[in-house]
Amino acid sequence: LFTREFYGNCYNALKADGIMVNQQGSPFYSEDAHAMQRSHKRIASTFQISRVYQAHIPTFAAGYWLFGFASKKYHPVDDLDSEAWSALNLRTRYYTTRLHRGAFYLPAFLEEMLQEVED
């Protein structure tokens, strides 16, 4: 399922301002970590913008999970409009724009794993 062809089809299905998000597993399990690297490499070779972000999900194995973000147009941090979000006056128990930005700042070991497949 998660082949270059699959991600190419996702790319083609999206409009110019479309965003694709996918699960990438936990980096603490070797098999998941390698799958994350393969997936990131394929997505990064398909989309102009590709980033990995993190979340703590206690019901998932290891409680620490990675996701992929890909877009033809939008950068998940640089294009975040905090003022527009604030203007919505939505009160959430979890999401904040600070948390949004922070999710994309990865620990050194993950940055190294991603750099291995980006080079």
Identify what each model region corresponds to.
Residues F2-A16, A44:
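A short glycine-rich, Lys/Arg-flanked "PGG" loop and its adjoining helix->strand segment in the class I
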Residues Y7-G8, A33-H56, G68-A70:
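Conserved Class I S-adenosyl-L-methionine
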